[in-house]
């Protein structure tokens, strides 16, 4: 591995330990040229995943982008960093276990929303407002009305006008229709 300080190719592993519930390996390394120490984290990647965007573009899946989105949704909420990492690891494992290499972005969003809904309802609403592109207060009102009626944690996929789509899936008082 290349040293991040001097760019030298020869580094030695001094210590390896399991990291994040065994889902990754944390390695302490030392550069043979400049003697600087640094840490790397290695994760198992079952397959290369690609995200299919709404405009049918296909881009490589980025775990860091998913983690950043989850962290933003959970910012200033009572969820510690360790739990956020477990959430992200679980989401990535679910995506890898799906058997698909091309995953529509709306499916990733639905998976994240389902998880956030169970963890923190405010984070769920924050994420949904970006994912569904809320533009008006009625969009927030519609999702707030849908929350008490959804007992099983199933999150509707809302294309286009969020309020209309949520209303279409919910009956009177926000109770989700089956």
From Swiss-Prot:
Does the keyword section mention Transcription regulation?
yes
- What PANTHER family is this protein classified in? TRANSCRIPTIONAL REPRESSOR NRDR
Give the ATP-cone domain ranges: 49-139
Q: Which family does it belong to?
A: Belongs to the NrdR family.
Q: Which cofactor does it need?
A: Zn(2+)
Which HAMAP family does this chain map to?
NrdR
From the UniProt record, give one GO term of the biological process aspect. Answer: negative regulation of DNA-templated transcription
Q: Which residues cross the membrane?
A: none
**Record-level Gene Ontology MF annotations:** ATP binding; DNA binding; zinc ion binding
Q: Where is the composition biased (Basic and acidic residues)?
A: 7-21
Annotated unnamed zinc fingers sit at 3-34
According to the UniProt entry, the coiled-coil residues are: none
Entry cofactor note text?
Binds 1 zinc ion.
Name of this chain's protein: Transcriptional repressor NrdR
Q: Which organism is it from?
A: Gluconacetobacter diazotrophicus (strain ATCC 49037 / DSM 5601 / CCUG 37298 / CIP 103539 / LMG 7603 / PAl5)
Q: Which UniProt keywords apply?
A: ATP-binding, DNA-binding, Metal-binding, Nucleotide-binding, Repressor, Transcription, Transcription regulation, Zinc, Zinc-finger
Keyword field contains Transcription regulation = yes
Q: Which InterPro entries match?
A: ATP-cone_dom, NrdR-like_N, RNR_NrdR-like
- Reported function: Negatively regulates transcription of bacterial ribonucleotide reductase nrd genes and operons by binding to NrdR-boxes.
Start and end residues of each stretch annotated as Disordered: 1-21
């Amino acid at each position: 591995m290349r040293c991040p300080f001097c760019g030298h190719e020869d580094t030695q592993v001094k210590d390896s330990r399991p990291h994040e519930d065994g889902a990754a390996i944390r390695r302490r390394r030392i550069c043979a040229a400049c003697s600087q120490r640094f840490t790397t984290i290695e994760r198992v990647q079952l397959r290369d995943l690609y995200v299919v965007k709404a405009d049918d573009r296909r881009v490589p899946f980025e775990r860091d982008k998913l983690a950043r989105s989850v962290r933003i949704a959970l910012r200033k909420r009572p969820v510690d960093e360790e739990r956020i990492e477990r959430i992200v690891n679980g989401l990535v494992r679910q995506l890898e276990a799906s058997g698909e290499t091309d995953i529509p972005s709306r499916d990733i969003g639905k998976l994240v929303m389902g998880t956030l809904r169970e963890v923190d309802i405010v984070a769920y609403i924050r994420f949904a407002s970006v994912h569904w592109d809320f533009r008006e207060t009625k969009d927030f009102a519609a999702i707030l009305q849908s929350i008490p009626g959804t007992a099983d944690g199933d999150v509707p996929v809302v294309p286009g006008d969020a309020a209309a789509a949520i209303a279409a899936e919910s009956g009177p008082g926000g109770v989700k229709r089956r």
